[in-house]
Amino acid sequence: MGRAVSVAACALNQWALDFEGNAERILRSISIAKSKGARYRLGPELEICGYGCADHYYESDTLLHSFQVLAKLLESPATQDIICDVGMPLMHRNVRYNCRVIFLNKKILLIRPKISLANAGNYRELRWFTPWNKARHVEEYLLPRIIQEVTGQDTVPFGDAVLATKDTCLGTEICEELWAPNSPHIEMGLDGVEIFTNSSGSHHVLRKAHTRVDLVNSATAKNGGIYILSNQKGCDGDRLYYDGCAMISMNGETVAQGSQFSLDDVEVLVATLDLEDVRSYRAEISSRNLAASKVNPFPRIKVNFALSCSDDLSVPICVPIQWRHHSPEEEICLGPACWLWDYLRRSKQAGFLLPLSGGIDSSATACIVYSMCRQVCLAVKNGNSEVLADARKIVHDETYIPEDPQEFCKRVFTTCYMASENSSQDTRNRAKLLAEQIGSYHINLNIDAAVKAIVGIFSMVTGRTPRFSVYGGSRRENLALQNVQARVRMVPAYLFAQLTLWTRGMPGGLLVLGSANVDESLRGYLTKYDCSSADINPIGGISKTDLKNFIQYCIENFQLTALRSIMAAPPTAELEPLMDGQVSQTDEADMGMTYAELSIYGKLRKIAKAGPYSMFCKLINLWKEICTPREVASKVKHFFRMYSVNRHKMTTLTPSYHAENYSPDDNRFDLRPFLYNTTWSWQFRCIDNQVSHLEKKEGISVAEDTD
């Protein structure tokens, strides 16, 4: 009858410029799709070269090697008798485009350039590509000789068209086009397109997955149709983790769901769906049919191929399922862990070293590494031969099988407690107990000799000896002595990362992990070039509030009882002298604000685009039950002073896993100056004027604010 179509969506762990590996994963996904009965296979955005090539897109080599891979795909027997939809950059009339190349049996059917480019947040597509602005227009694209020799075609259609097979009609969207207000699927659906495809390069952000799922389902809820979404997965070379979530939806309901976090390099979803369900769904939507009668038609590329078989009554049809979302704590547990695994295996290092202080942040980082070890053991148990091969390379043992997370952790994870005279026995014990429970190779060392040597050099040169404030020193002296301790810790961290495995008779070196959270980075509550200066930081995009919830999750799910005392202890840097052996310094007292307040400031500054005055205006309403306008003004001023004074620290911040949309990451997400006029005189005067107006209105008499 020709009504049951079988289609495949893929999530591939591609790597920028890894043309060899990318081609292998694409071919494997096509073979899997065919083995499951699919007649159409959709891959992620720019899958041939990997999405994160950045300025390598300018290079002609990137285009050349992409065409070489395309030729390999066209020639492969695996790509025969299935419509293959792959992504790559190419140049048309001296303009670079982000494209889908759709082919069947060594013939290119259509090259579809991206219409709406992603250019916000971490995305910079307009830097490298140009959008195709010729709606419903097709031109002839002259193929390079390397492709002509395979296909026998000189030119192929290039532009905004749809494919008309023998049994249905397919239309293409590329990532951002689904998120755009005028998504192409709207007009395509009105023009009779029944299957919409979307190849994405969408990265993970906490609590974002439901938005993507809702967009896909809503795309066909009003207009009917089948929607296929493929996405990249894994770390392809930078701060982002692409979180898969391949899915297939029909008439507003999910029928197939892929994993969001997985160590599988290739994941293929196949669904068989009844086209008559789409047609009957549309038939009763009179508003849709009236709109369809007025739509301008898309150019149709006729394809002598069917996505269904002639006798399909016995083919089982997929039914709707309920999408299973991860909690934020599960996302923190799994996303950064998968990112760390990709970084470790692709950097060809032998593990990680973490300065473990016994506080929440470094403990959360340790738990993420432990989660990675659990994921590796689970993947090997489930038969993932690639993970097993990677694990053996990392530990330099061709017969090794990671079965126990603690045992694997001992091989690949070193933790180091770096004590000073200001460290408490409590934090030392907490770090030791947590290391024992997760299985890391743990080291205790003391940095006092190094600190005294450096301060001694200063005293010898200047004739002056700085003192902590509790001993009569000035604020400058106090801060300098704290920073010396913090900075000294960076040097042994890298030394032990290079040589710890050597002392254990094991080959390789370790990557140093940092543990500064997103709130502390925003406030600048960290020492430049201290042990937060590391190779990578898995928690740098995560708030303190979420980290606390994650720690509680680990207590409940991993039975890490050592975390209970860590959760109960107030966060402290332990850089000032102890009082009667007890900690006298706390982070929130040092910062002059709470972590909860910092999260609010961060979201207003970045997500709500609020400067000092706008933030004040929003907070006087948000906090009207707990703060007077003058108190709100004081808090806002203090935040912006500290933010601007410390912004320079972001320029050298350790590359961090991107998890929050209010991240202050200076690399490309949050582009700001790092030399500010920290008085904010005009802005703060506007706040003061508004405070005076509000107090006058309320009949409050307050002395002039000199803050």
UniProtKB/Swiss-Prot annotation:
Its EC number is 6.3.5.1. It is an enzyme of class 6 (ligase). It catalyses: deamido-NAD(+) + L-glutamine + ATP + H2O = L-glutamate + AMP + diphosphate + NAD(+) + H(+). Residues 325-706 are annotated as: Ligase. It holds the Pfam family CN_hydrolase. The keyword ATP-binding applies. Keywords: ATP-binding, Ligase, NAD, Nucleotide-binding. Catalyzes the final step of the nicotinamide adenine dinucleotide (NAD) de novo synthesis pathway, the ATP-dependent amidation of deamido-NAD using L-glutamine as a nitrogen source. NCBIfam families: nadE. This is Glutamine-dependent NAD(+) synthetase. It comes from Gallus gallus. The gene is NADSYN1.
